[in-house]
């Protein structure tokens, strides 16, 4: 019996020992760091697999912003990883979640200094870097700590900028001078940089009129290969659009523009500047995201008819203004983009006015619209009207998401009606739509 067991064990060992490298790498790919380390101790071959480049190309490093024993070692382990496997990295994402105090921001800054220094020395593969939501304008970031972090990041980008294809510094919240210093670091080794994706949404602090900065326009002039550009509307100017027309006309495909109520957005941007950019960059599509910028007069200054608008998101959260009306925007402004609009997202408190008819007509007018999401005060029958239009071929939605606000705690009646509507159009919904509809008490 013992001999049979030994034979079986030898067979099992030989089976694993002769497993092809491609299969072993696939097994390792599914393992977490701790299990990979344990597996690497099995034999020399498995240890060699541990150092396969394709296991370490993508990495997300998360630092907790709260003091905790559980997360105490994450700063040290991040450095250990970069020293051990950093040379294989191609895509790196770093997260620092809601720092609690200056002690933790200092610890993060010191860790980042070592991490970026090591990465700059050992890596020549990095294509994508994302460091989001640092919010460096918060009080937990003392001036010296903030300055040291910016210095380390700038030095790293000076060395690695020529390799980077994608850079996201969303939510950094810098001054204009600090932000432009970092952007200029990308082109330090040459007079231009070839990054194709740049995300600088909330890169600058609130209340800054970046559109008037010559520093910013000069920094953006170094980009010659942009395909995707994400930024705030307080960065948009005729000069920036002119720069994009001259330097990125052959590549620029998507612009994502966020306009927040606290960001300056009263600047004059001429339609001819947008028209020139749209003409030069013929494949350009622009997506707008408005947060608490809802009044028609403001929107009309921004949403010029010359812009090739693909998507519009209008969100006011739960703020209610009885002097505000959404109707002119739905009937006069948005239909201007009927030939290009593909996505519409609404979230507003319209308790003081009914908009069912205007919303329905807008959907019918935008023949390319495939995504429609709305959270608002609506009649339940609004959903049925949309489904009927879809069935009759008057619209071609792929996604329909509706949250129907009500002024009652109980939504039993609305829920029952929605179930009846679903049963009536179930075949259509199941075959054509990503469908989510719910009644929601708004008290």
UniProtKB/Swiss-Prot annotation:
Q: According to its UniProt entry, what is the function of this protein? A: Substrate-recognition component of the SCF (SKP1-CUL1-F-box protein)-type E3 ubiquitin ligase complex.
What InterPro entries does its record include? F-box-like_dom_sf, F-box_dom, FBXO31/39, LRR_dom_sf
Q: What is the lineage of its organism?
A: Eukaryota, Metazoa, Chordata, Craniata, Vertebrata
Q: What CDD domains has UniProt attached to this entry?
A: F-box_FBXO39
Q: Specify the F-box domain's residue ranges.
A: 13-59
The record, for Gene3D superfamilies, names:
1.20.1280.50, Ribonuclease Inhibitor (3.80.10.10)
Subunit organization: Directly interacts with SKP1 and CUL1.
Q: What is this protein called?
A: F-box only protein 39
Q: Which domain of life is it from?
A: Eukaryota
Q: Which UniProt keywords apply?
A: Ubl conjugation pathway
